[in-house]
């Protein structure tokens, strides 16, 4: 009976409060909290699962952190055009026209993306300058960012700059160094673009091996794009780096003409 009396008293006070609000020109629910998201009441979770509002904020944050927001508005699968890849000659290396080769590359990439959450793999995109390797990695990055995966996208120059700072910069706090390394080694996907453009020395080789090996051990996905041939990769780095990549990555050769040059000619 005490609880019934208490409920009745609360109901009475609530009605008095609403009456006072209405009396002074305010809506009856004026003092109730106003939520940005009515579904989760701004907690970010519904029944232990991330609310759609939280997922949206994560995507926005990841885009801002990846430095890719503006680029990905134009470089994504909806803007991918196979017409830039010739179909009037066959490449000796693949036995296919560049267009058919790219179709098969896209099939492999789509399969990679569909299984990413369950079985994250690794890709090596290699081929001549301007054949669309960076464009394709941007397409992949957008797909995964849109699904709230953490994506770190770096040119090889930037990657080794960061690793060098973490190793030798005394002005950089240990907290900042740890955060940077954690981001590089633990993100769902690390994209290393244009491997081979950095100054090569024993430091870059050892750091590259550590990065690749740690991510493999932690089952984190890595995508590398490069203009280097297999022989160049082996010679420039080391046999063990070459072995780690060729044994654990899906190797995708991209053929064709320089698309950037084609676009420049078309614009003029």
Predicted feature descriptions by range:
Residues 25-76:
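Interdomain "pre-motor" coupling segment immediately N-terminal to P-loop NTPase/helicase cores
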Residues 110-115, 162-190, 206-214, 240:
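Conserved alpha-helical scaffold flanking the Walker A/P-loop in AAA+ ATPase domains
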Residues 120-136:
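Walker A/P-loop nucleotide-binding motif
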Residues 135-148:
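P-loop NTPase Walker A phosphate-binding motif
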């Amino acid at each position: 009976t005490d609880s019934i009396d208490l409920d009745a008293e609360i109901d009475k006070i609530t009605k008095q409060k609403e009456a006072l609000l209405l009396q002074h020109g305010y809506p009856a629910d004026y003092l109730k909290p106003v939520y940005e998201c009515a579904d989760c009441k701004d907690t970010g979770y519904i029944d232990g699962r991330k609310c759609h509002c939280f997922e949206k904020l994560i995507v926005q944050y990841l885009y801002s952190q990846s430095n890719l927001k503006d680029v990905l508005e134009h470089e994504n699968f909806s803007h991918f055009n196979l017409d830039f890849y010739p179909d009037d000659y066959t490449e000796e290396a693949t036995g296919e026209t560049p267009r058919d080769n790219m179709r098969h590359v896209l099939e492999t990439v789509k399969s990679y993306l569909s299984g990413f959450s369950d079985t994250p793999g690794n890709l090596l995109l290699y081929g001549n300058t301007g054949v669309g390797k960076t464009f394709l990695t941007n397409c992949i990055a957008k797909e995964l960012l849109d699904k709230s995966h953490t994506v770190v996208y770096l040119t090889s120059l930037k990657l080794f700059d960061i690793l060098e700072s973490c190793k030798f910069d005394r002005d950089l706090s240990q907290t900042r160094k740890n955060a940077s390394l954690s981001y590089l080694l633990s993100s769902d996907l690390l994209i290393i673009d244009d491997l081979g453009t950095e100054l090569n020395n024993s430091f870059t080789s050892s750091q590259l091996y550590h990065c690749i090996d740690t991510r493999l051990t932690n089952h984190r996905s890595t995508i590398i794009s490069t203009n280097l041939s297999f022989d160049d990769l082996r010679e420039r780095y080391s046999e063990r780096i070459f072995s780690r990549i060729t044994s654990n990555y899906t190797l995708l050769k991209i053929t064709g003409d320089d698309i950037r040059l084609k676009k420049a000619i078309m614009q003029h």
